[in-house]
Design a protein with these regions (language model features):
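C-terminal motif of bacterial Sec signal peptides marking the signal peptidase cleavage site
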Residues: 17-20
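Bacterial N-terminal signal peptides that target proteins for export
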Residues: 1-8
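Acidic/histidine-rich, surface-exposed loop or edge segments in extracytoplasmic proteins
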Residues: 35-43, 100-109
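Sec-dependent N-terminal signal peptides
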Residues: 8-14
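Glycine-rich loop/hinge motif
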Residues: 48, 112-113
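Bacterial signal peptide processing site
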Residues: 22-24
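A cross-family detector of function-defining hotspots
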Residues: 27-29, 34, 46, 53-95, ...
Length: 174
């Protein structure tokens, strides 16, 4: 009887734990130690890089963001440039008045090495080199690079034809 009551208590907890895990999604941190470093120090969008001040964003892009979203917990602000919050060109995450991340989902902007949305996986590897990791996240293939010296990460989201759909550059917090 005692085993049965333990089983009835523990079994639902195990099911809940398994249900909350997405087997198709592997966190990028898993690849950090096994991926060689790539220099990403010069990555920027119109001279705005990770660590730039929030004031540099509007100044360098020569316009104010079209949309601003404020999140209270954890505190950060998102500056969005584009037609809408869903169909944007570039989005900057501002934490403590500094850029901590930016996303590109249109070909209007490119990486420092000239990669735009629509470019191929081969173009990315030609520009950034062979020291990348590859993972799946919510059905998309992601290839990424770490700059361990400057604590930066860049990821390229690929569609089913291995074309770049989106680009994420962010500060590494480890």
């Amino acid at each position: 009887m005692r085993i049965k009551s333990h089983f009835l208590f523990i079994f639902p907890l195990i099911l809940l734990l398994l249900a909350s895990c997405d087997p198709s999604s592997t966190p990028k941190e898993k690849y950090y130690s096994s991926t060689k470093t790539t220099n990403l120090e010069l990555e920027n969008v119109k001279s705005v890089s990770i660590g730039s001040s929030k004031y540099d964003v509007a100044s360098c892009l020569r316009k104010k963001p079209k949309f601003i979203e404020v999140t209270e917990q954890p505190p950060y602000t998102t500056y969005i440039y584009g037609k809408s919050t869903e169909k944007y060109d570039v989005e900057f995450k501002i934490v403590a008045n500094q850029v901590s991340r930016y996303d590109l989902i249109s070909s209007k902007y490119s990486t420092e090495k000239g990669i735009h949305t629509g470019d191929s996986k081969k173009d990315v590897i030609r520009a950034y080199g062979e020291n990348y990791y590859e993972r799946e996240d919510t059905g998309a293939t992601i290839i990424g690079y770490f700059d361990k010296n400057h604590k930066l990460n860049i990821e390229f989201s690929l569609d089913d034809k291995d074309k770049v759909e989106g680009i994420l550059v962010q500060k590494i917090n480890n």
